[in-house]
Amino acid sequence: MPALPDYGEFARMLYGTCMISDPWLSGAERFRLQGLVLTSSQADALRTAAEPIGWIYHELAEIVLERPHLLDDFFQLTPFQKAMWLAAEGRWHGIARVDLFLCDDGRIRSCEMNSDTPSGEAEAVLLNELLHPYHPGTTDPNTALAEAFWQMLVMQCGDVAPERAAIIYPTDLPEDLSMIAIYRQWLEARGCRVIIGSPYNLGLDAGGRVTVFEHPVELIVRHYKTDWWGERETIWSNQQEFADAEPLARELLLLLEAESAGCVTVVNPFGAVVTQNKLSLALMWEHRELFSAQASAWIAEYIPETRRLSALNATTLRREEWVLKSDYGCEGDSVVVGPFVKPADWALALAAAIPRHWVAQRYFEVAPIEDDLRPNVGVYLIGGRAAGFYTRLSRKATDYTAVTAPTFISI
């Protein structure tokens, strides 16, 4: 096996991509150069788990579409969140990432699926490209991710290749700039002109077309979270109110009306406001009778027991057995993993959490690899099909401090 480059040399390789410019985070290395090498059977098992989980969410969307009372009675959505869901008419999917774990008992479990604004694509593709030569006897499972993403966009646009697109993202936050850059590269390489901007740069021209910086576009690639378009709600009783709690009413209604009129396509669709909500996981367990027999079996197989905190007696939740998750937290944000926190911190979290915004999910043990690291293997679903892998390694919960590693499959 060729010797891996030292980290300084690797950092220069990353800088050379002109996409990833932060190989260190707070002075710590962000990446592990030694790849996670899956056997073919492990890779197949992960893909086989991810696609049924995508189908579970598809059924869930149909269930909520047929039972709109759940928007109030179960999810307790805000008015603008309900507007997003109703305008989308059940459409929620373009690209998603299912986070999977190989467990001590040999099973595969999923803690959640990011169906709203999944990230990590640049790291998944570029790390594999740069480090694959140092992993002979393996294949790179991410080589087709860009083309799969493009074909999904074409399909969403009525099987017509978009000529002008905008990537809408929170321009004041730098975390996902590499993903914005690689999306832009993928689209421009296929002849699509790309403009980048924030929701505040949206407008309409005289013909009713959506514009970004006054340039008309036919496709919006949305990397601005659904819960940020709507009313911002606090999730802790001791949390300060948001300074910008009001919905982006002008910008959101502009897009919803334009899409309803067939003037623009938004990917991911705004229906992700329901599937991204962690209460979806609770619906799977609290109302399994609403799902097909096959989906119900998949829920039991892959989704840890999840309940609304408002439906539980919080004083009976044993810290060692449960994980608390907020409704729209992602990437480890607003997650309290019981076994990893002190009893006093667990009690404080339960006391401060506003129950209607939280779920409790059964804790499960992840099989560690070397250095006691626990892999979180994200499987990208594009159009419902497994399309690539994104691996993060951590000793406890997966959060922003997790180390990213390339993912390969042994030949």
Where do the model's predicted regions map?
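Preference for protein termini
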Residues: M1-I411
